[in-house]
C-alpha cells in the first residue's frame, strides 16, 4: 500500500526538487570554508568509519562507500515491511519486537556505550543546544507554513510542526550513527536520547492542548499537570534507566565480568537490526492518507532544513567533529512514529502525520546519503 501510494506521487517534480537541493548543498560544501575545515580535518580512522578514504574524497565513487553504510539501514526496513505485506508475520508481531527494542535492546546498547565511553571533558549542554535549536527553528517554520500558507487549523499546524522536527532517532538514528560514526557518535546520540523524547513529548503535548483550547474551548490542563505526568513516565523510561546505569558504571569504574560483558555485547548488537525490522513492520499502518502538499513540505523541512540547522549551530558552537556528524545524521532521518501517536492522542492530524512518516521514510535514503556525503 505504501509503495503503490508513493507511486502516484509526482516523482518527476520531486526528483527535480531533489536535484536542485543537491546542487545547492554541493555548492555550499565547496564554497563554505567551515565545511571544508570539517571535511579536511576528519581523522583517518573516522573518515574510514564513514566510508571515506583520502583518495575517494575527491572522486565520485565515494558515493558507493556512502551507500555501503546507508543502504543496509533501509533494506532492513524494507525487509520488515515485506514480511508483513507477504503475510509471513502479523503486524502485531512488529509491536512485540518494537517493545523488545525499546525496553531491552536499546537501553542495553546505551548502557554499554556510556559505561565504556571517554567523554574527554565534553559538556552535554552544547550538544543539547545544538540539536534542539535546530528542532525549534524547523518546528516553528513547519507550524507557520501550515497555518498561514496552507491555511490549516491551528491543531493541524502543531501536528505538522511536530512531523517536521521529530526524528526517528531510536529506530533509524542509532543504527545509522553506529555504522557511520562509530562509538563516539553513539555516545553523543545516547546523551541526546536521555532528554529527546521527554522534551519533544512535553512540547508537543503543551502546544496541542493550547491549540485545542483555542479551537474548541473546554478545560485545559495546567503545565504542572503535564510535567507531573511526563516526569512519572520519565523515571520509568527504559532509555533513561539504561543511561543512568551506564553513567554510574562509568563514573564508579566498575568493570563487567567477561560473561556479563559478552551477554551485554550480544544484546546490544541486536538493537540496530531489530529496530529497523520492527520499524518496517510498523510502517504497514502508516500509509499516505492525504494532505500531500503539507506532507511533502514537512518532509523537505525534516530531511533538509533540520539537519542544516543542526550543522550550522554545531559549527557555530564548536561541537566536536564526531558529535556534529552524529547529530546531523540522526536529524536527517525520517519522521518518527511519535508524531502519529500525538495526533492519535488528540484525535486530529492523522493524515498529515501518517503521510509525512510514509513519504519521509520512502525518500529518507536520499537525504541520509546526501548528508553523509556532505559530512565527508
How would you describe each model-predicted region?
Residues 2-10:
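Extreme N-terminal basic, low-complexity initiation segments
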Residues 9-12, 37, 54-57:
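Intrinsically disordered, low-complexity segments enriched in serine/proline and basic residues
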Residues 32-33, 45-376:
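Alpha-helical transmembrane segments of multi-pass small-molecule/ion transporters
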Residues 20, 27-30:
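Low-complexity, intrinsically disordered or signal/transmembrane-proximal segments
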